[in-house]
Amino acid sequence: MNETIEPLNPIAFQLGPIAVHWYGIIIGLGALLGLWLAVREGERRGLHKDTFVDLVLFAIPIAILCARAYYVIFQWGYYSEHPDQIIQIWNGGLAIHGGLIGAVLTGIIYAKVKGLSFWKLADIAAPSILLGQAIGRWGNFMNQEAHGEAVSRAFLENLHLPDFIINQMYIDGQYYQPTFLYESLWSFTGVVVLLLLRKANLKRGELFLIYVIWYSMGRYFIEGLRTDSLMLTENLRIAQVISIVLILCAAALIAYRRFKGREIKRYQEM
């Protein structure tokens, strides 16, 4: 028996001819809450409240551009035939790894120009970035994307999910695994872990590197469940390769900075 389930409307409201999508609203909300958290911790760490406001004004647009460019590059076979869709980011298609590249490069340049420690900024921003990612995945939910393989409704009900999530996972006559939810929950858990680790007084830069490891671990396993992965080869998922590289590099950098002998400031030091 075929079911008739209407998906949630991806458009929040209209401003004349302009459609405002939930995808953009949710990503914007994640960015604002992340900024609030960073400003609050930055002030506690002796930084002016405008430090992160100014940084975000540069980092967000650059991160979005890099996230889109990353996605388009690895889907060039499609976009070369549909160039008019390259700018249609409201329909999805922002790669988190691309966004991180843009954000990190912006942070490095910003820190150098302002005479600040990049590692200090990165540590403070780490929980905020992960919070933004956790919230942003719900934009994928509204667009019915970033899901996993086909499953039964009973499978989703056994996860004790609310009906609005189960129904939104009904796409073209089939239910799918809510991998967006798995990653969102993993990221929310990571935010709590990072906030607790701030009290451990790690060496400067280690909180950010732990964020990289945490996110990459979750992304590696969850990516294996997805059906819309960007592929490097027929059987090789780009996000999984990048995740492994990031885990190894972050762990190696932590070890190198701890054992090279030079004194490195602690997180709690101004």
Curated annotation (Swiss-Prot):
It comes from the Bacteria. One of its GO terms (biological process) is lipoprotein biosynthetic process. Keywords: Cell membrane, Membrane, Transferase, Transmembrane, Transmembrane helix. Its EC number is 2.5.1.145. The chain crosses the membrane at residues 18-38, 55-75, 89-109, 115-135, 177-197, 205-225, 236-256. GO terms for molecular function: phosphatidylglycerol-prolipoprotein diacylglyceryl transferase activity. Pathway: Protein modification; lipoprotein biosynthesis (diacylglyceryl transfer). Its main location: membrane. One of its GO terms (cellular component) is plasma membrane. It holds the Pfam family LGT. InterPro entries: Lgt. It is an enzyme of class 2 (transferase). It is found in: Cell membrane. It is a multi-pass membrane protein. Belongs to the Lgt family. PANTHER family: PHOSPHATIDYLGLYCEROL--PROLIPOPROTEIN DIACYLGLYCERYL TRANSFERASE, PROLIPOPROTEIN DIACYLGLYCERYL TRANSFERASE. Catalyzes the transfer of the diacylglyceryl group from phosphatidylglycerol to the sulfhydryl group of the N-terminal cysteine of a prolipoprotein, the first step in the formation of mature lipoproteins. HAMAP family: Lgt. This is Phosphatidylglycerol--prolipoprotein diacylglyceryl transferase.
